[in-house]
Amino acid sequence: MKQPFCAPAAALRRVLDAAAALPRPAVEILPLEKACGRIAAKALCARMDQPPFDRSPLDGYALHSADTAGASRETPVTLPVTMKLYAGDAPAAALPVGCAARIMTGAPLPEGADCVLMQELTDSGEETVQLYSSLKPQQNVVLRGGDIAAGAIIAAEGTPLTPAHLGVLAGQGYAEVPVYRALTVGILSTGSELLAPGEPWAPGKIYDANGIQNAARLGQLGFAVQRRHCSDDPEVIACQLRELLTGCDAVITSGGISVGQKDYLPAVLERLGAQMLFAGVAQKPGSPMLAAEIAGKLVFCLSGNPFAAAATLEQYAVPALLRAAGRREESCILPRTTCTLTTGFSKSSKGDRYLRAKAAGGSVTIPGEGSAEAHSSGSLSAMIGCNCLVKLPAGSGPVAPGEEVEVLYFVY
C-alpha cells in the first residue's frame, strides 16, 4: 500500500475527482428560513422583473420630463397635482400631460410619467406644485427589471445559499427551495492518550482537541457530524471505522498514520479494502496524511498533531467534502492571492511549507512574530484568528517583512 508522497496539487486533484464521481446527495425542499448555507440542487431563476414596475426611489412628484423644461427657483413651473401614490398602490390611470402625481418612496410610477422630482426641489404643494428644477427622462426612476430581469439566474446549481441569495429569492416570491441533503461526516480521533473534554485530567493524558476542532469546522460549513475517539487498538479502530462508514457519508480520522509502533490506521484501511487516493503529501505540516475511498465513501486520515491536522483538513478534506456535498468545484478550492508579509519566518523550506496566517487589505501576518516554534505542527493556539495559509514553496529560504507571498484563504 506504500506509495510515493503526492505533490499537493496532485493530491487535491485526486480527492476532488473522487468526490465529483460520487452520486450527488438526495434533494430535499426547505423553507427559505432554513436554507441558509445549504447547496442549491438546481438553478434558481428570477420569476419576474425586479422591481416589477418603474418605481420612485424618493418622496416627490412623478412627472412628464417635457413638462419640467426651464423650471428653476427663479422661473418655477406650476402644475396641478392629479393623484397621490404610496408604496403598495396600483395607479388607477395614466398621468395626463401637464399634470403631476404626488409620489412616495417605493410607489409605482403612473403610465406616462418618466421622471421624479424630489420634494426638496418643489414647494411641496398638494393641489398644485411649483417645480424648481428641470429633469431628463428616467431621472430619479428605478426602472422595471433594473435589479434583476425575469429568467436571470439567482443561484446556479451547486451554489451555497447566502442570506443575500435568500433575500433575492424571497423578493421573487419563493417560499421554499430545493437543496442537497446535508452530508454527515464521521470524526474519529485515535489515541490511547486522549481524554474527552470534561473528563478529569490524568498524568500522561491530553484532551481531544482535534476532534472538537475538526467537528466544529465541518459544522461551520453545514455538515452534520458524528464524533468519537478511541484507543490505539487496531480492532477497536476497525470497529469504529466500520460503524462510522455505515452511518455517515464520509469519515475523517486524526492520529495513528505515521510510522510509530501504534500507528495502525494504514493497516486498518488495507483490511477494510480501502482504495488509496494518496498516502502522504509532499509538504509540511501534515505530510503523513492519507486519503482513500471505502465502499464509495471518502476517508481522510489526518495527523494527530493539531496544526498538521488543521492545515490538511483545509487543503484537502474540506474541498473534497464540499464537492461531494454538491458544490461547484470553483467554490470548493481555497482562493489564492498574493499578499505582503508584515512578519517574517526564520526557517528555510526544503519542501512546500504552509503557515497559518491572518490576511487583510493586501497584507498578511504570520502569528508568533514568525518564529518557527510558534508554527510547529503540534501548536494549536496560533491558529486562533487565522483565515488563511501562507505557502512557502520548496527551496525557499527565510522570508522577511515586506516580501510578497502566496496566500490561500480558507473556504466558507
Model-derived features with residue positions:
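Helix-rich terminal scaffold detector
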Residues: 1-9, 177-302, 306-312
